[in-house]
């Protein structure tokens, strides 16, 4: 029992000394970040250079639009005339304009689909009044094919 207790005491003191050495090399700075000092001379940290005034602050890459992309920018309502479009535009602006045009085209396609459905219903009702149903058309076609087969059999 005594040796176990002594072993625990030695291990505890060893742990405390290691802990003390580790925490003495770490100190809190004003920004409350842990900073390790290892006893060597350290260079003072340099502040990052301020960005140039000539570059964009968001660092957005710019793109020179083609004629087709200029038309898309006009169709989307972003610009009124082609003269108003700047020489370079951001990719985000182009994507937003393309998405608007896609939505407008999909609305047109939906309207054309609905108009086509209504037109087919009207044409179907007109054909039903003239008794041009699919059943009657199929029966006429089969009768005509039978007659042609009978005529062919007689000639042979």
Curated annotation (Swiss-Prot):
Keywords: Apoptosis, Membrane, Mitochondrion, Transmembrane, Transmembrane helix
Stored InterPro entries: DUF1075 (IPR009432)
Region (Disordered): 37-57
Compartments where located: Mitochondrion membrane
The keyword Nucleotidyltransferase appears for this protein: no
Keyword Ribosomal protein: no
Required for proapoptotic activity, as annotated region: 78-104
GO cellular component, as recorded: mitochondrial membrane; mitochondrion
Matches recorded under Pfam families: DUF1075
TM region positions: 105-122
GO BP annotation list: cellular response to hypoxia; neuron apoptotic process; positive regulation of apoptotic process; positive regulation of release of cytochrome c from mitochondria
Major site of localization recorded for this protein: mitochondrion
Membrane topology: Single-pass membrane protein
Family statement: Belongs to the UPF0389 family.
Purpose: Proposed to be involved in regulation of apoptosis; the exact mechanism may differ between cell types/tissues. May be involved in hypoxia-induced cell death of transformed cells implicating cytochrome C release and caspase activation (such as CASP9) and inducing mitochondrial permeability transition. May be involved in hypoxia-induced cell death of neuronal cells probably by promoting release of AIFM1 from mitochondria to cytoplasm and its translocation to the nucleus; however, the involvement of caspases has been reported conflictingly.
PANTHER family registered for this protein in UniProt: GROWTH AND TRANSFORMATION-DEPENDENT PROTEIN, PROTEIN FAM162A
Subunit structure of this chain's protein: Interacts with HSP90AB1; HSP90AB1 is essential for FAM162A mitochondrial localization and pro-apoptotic activity. Interacts with VDAC2; the interaction is probably involved in inducing mitochondrial permeability transition.
Entry protein name: Protein FAM162A
């Amino acid at each position: 029992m005594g040796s176990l207790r002594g072993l625990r005491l030695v291990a505890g003191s060893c742990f405390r000394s290691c802990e003390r050495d580790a925490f003495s090399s770490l100190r809190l700075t004003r920004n409350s970040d842990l900073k390790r000092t290892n006893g060597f001379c350290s260079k003072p940290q340099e502040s990052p250079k301020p960005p140039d005034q000539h570059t964009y602050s968001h660092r957005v890459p710019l793109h020179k639009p083609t004629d087709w992309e200029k038309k898309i920018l006009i169709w989307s309502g972003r610009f009124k005339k082609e003269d108003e479009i700047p020489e370079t535009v951001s990719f985000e602006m182009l994507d937003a304009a393309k998405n608007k045009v896609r939505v407008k085209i999909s609305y047109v396609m939906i309207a054309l689909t609905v108009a086509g459905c209504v037109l087919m219903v009207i044409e179907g009702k007109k054909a039903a009044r003239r008794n041009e149903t699919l059943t009657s058309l199929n029966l006429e076609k089969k009768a005509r094919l039978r007659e042609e087969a009978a005529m062919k059999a007689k000639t042979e």
